[in-house]
Amino acid sequence: MSLYRSVVWFAKGLREYTKSGYESACKDFVPHDLEVQIPGRVFLVTGGNSGIGKATALEIAKRGGTVHLVCRDQAPAEDARGEIIRESGNQNIFLHIVDLSDPKQIWKFVENFKQEHKLHVLINNAGCMVNKRELTEDGLEKNFAANTLGVYILTTGLIPVLEKEHDPRVITVSSGGMLVQKLNTNDLQSERTPFDGTMVYAQNKRQQVVLTERWAQGHPAIHFSSMHPGWADTPGVRQAMPGFHARFGDRLRSEAQGADTMLWLALSSAAAAQPSGRFFQDRKPVSTHLPLATASSSPAEEEKLIEILEQLAQTFK
């Protein structure tokens, strides 16, 4: 990451990604965009047991949607499901325990889900940031396994289910941190470079943006989007970035503020009217590059990413 890119991004973050940035942006929101009732619509939210995923799942439930929570750990997931049911009065909240860094588990879940359920909206919210290089049981670098390969398998596996329904959507929670990274397909699992968990996470988030753009091109019947929730005060941030949280805690967005654009992309007709494949921040499509610091990738590089992911995905099927 260049010094220029780092400085520009950090200044942008302080201006736009904080609580005050949200409070400024929301002045332009259309209030009735989220005044919708959605009985019969089916949503799948990964990482829906805490943070902005849980906040999004709760708001969907309050509006009558059926919600499938895909979570890793049984006990906190059960607690979250119970809380969502109590607060929303909606019983149509279902729980699936899946480790999204385990491709074999994801494939098994996808095959079972396809047989038993319909789906209108997939929300790839779950994320992983480990700060020391760890390998999964399958020998995959953990951040890459959960943030990139896991998202790839889950999304491509569920595309046939989504394509059967009216107004299908896929929302992937990326991060503004991806602005400091250019797509790098030469070391996807951090085998040849010093490991920096924050930068690996940012690279994964760049990969998600590229995948979203490519899926939008290949599957025009589905509305794809990626988004940045801003800097939100969530359990994940507190655990993965304790220093950052300690420094900026009082300036961070609430979980509801961080979830707002995710919810807007999932529910509003205004979001569906936007071109597919875009990257959103505070209900607006924004550039995927910093000014004077483009991180664009070639079609060949993007195709290489997809080829590697597809080969890995099939290995574990």
UniProtKB/Swiss-Prot annotation:
Residues reported in the UniProt entry to bind NAD(+): S50, I52, Y201, K205, T234
Species of origin: Homo sapiens
Alphabetic keyword roster: NAD, NADP, Oxidoreductase
PANTHER family per record: DEHYDROGENASE/REDUCTASE SDR FAMILY MEMBER 12, DEHYDROGENASE_REDUCTASE SDR FAMILY MEMBER 12
Class of this enzyme: oxidoreductase
Encoding gene, per UniProt annotation: DHRS12
Protein EC: 1.1.-.-
Protein name: Dehydrogenase/reductase SDR family member 12
Cross-referenced Gene3D superfamilies: NAD(P)-binding Rossmann-like Domain
Molecular function GO terms recorded: oxidoreductase activity
Known function: Putative oxidoreductase.
